[in-house]
Design a protein with these regions (language model features):
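Short active-site oxyanion
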Residues: 7-10, 91-93
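Aromatic pocket-lining residues of Rossmann-like dinucleotide-binding sites
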Residues: 24-25
Length: 148
C-alpha cells in the first residue's frame, strides 16, 4: 500500500528488508544480503526478546519474536517467488557480502528466481557499513537511475 501511494523510484532493502523489497513488484529494487529464508535460519529469526539496532520514531527499544511470528514468515517465504515475470526479473538486483555468515543462501535463491547477472558480490559482511554503501550500493543506485 505504501509503495502504491508513494510511488518510489527505487526500493533498497537489507536482510529482512531485502526479502520484503523483493516482493514489491513493479518497482526497481536492490536487495542487500536478503534473508529469503528467515524462518528456517536460526541465526536470523529465533524466539525471544531483542533490542532494535537503530532508534525508532515510537521510542520502542525492544521487540519480541514468537513461534507464531516464525510460522507467519514461513508461510510468506513459501509464496515469495511466485509469478515473477520476465519484466520483473529486469527490475531486481541482489548485492551479496562475501563475508556474510548470517545469510548464506541469498545468491543461490536469487539466481534461481531472477537473473544471474543481476548479482553483485562485494567485500563485506551481513550488516552494511558506510564504506559498502558508498562503494557498492550508491554506485548501483546511480547506474540504475541512469537507465530511466
Amino acid at each position: 500500500e505504501l509503495c502504491e501511494k508513494e510511488q518510489p523510484d527505487m526500493i533498497v532493502g537489507t536482510s529482512m528488508g531485502g526479502m520484503y523489497a523483493q516482493q514489491m513488484r513493479g518497482f526497481k529494487r536492490i536487495l542487500v544480503n536478503p534473508a529469503f529464508t528467515m524462518s528456517t535460519n536460526s541465526k536470523v529469526l529465533k524466539t525471544g526478546e531483542y533490542h532494535f539496532f537503530n532508534g525508532r520514531y515510537d521510542g520502542a527499544k525492544t521487540f519480541r519474536i514468537t513461534r507464531d511470528i516464525i510460522q507467519h514468515f514461513n508461510q510468506m517465504e513459501r509464496q515469495q517467488f511466485k509469478n515473477i515475470t520476465e519484466d520483473e526479473k529486469q527490475l531486481c538486483w541482489c548485492l551479496v557480502g562475501l563475508r556474510d555468515t548470517t545469510v548464506t543462501n541469498a545468491e543461490a535463491l536469487f539466481k534461481k528466481n531472477y537473473l544471474a547477472d543481476h548479482v553483485i558480490r562485494f567485500d563485506g559482511e551481513h550488516q552494511l557499513t558506510e564504506k559498502v554503501i558508498k562503494k557498492v550500493v550508491l554506485p548501483l543506485v546511480e547506474r540504475l537511475r541512469m537507465k530511466e
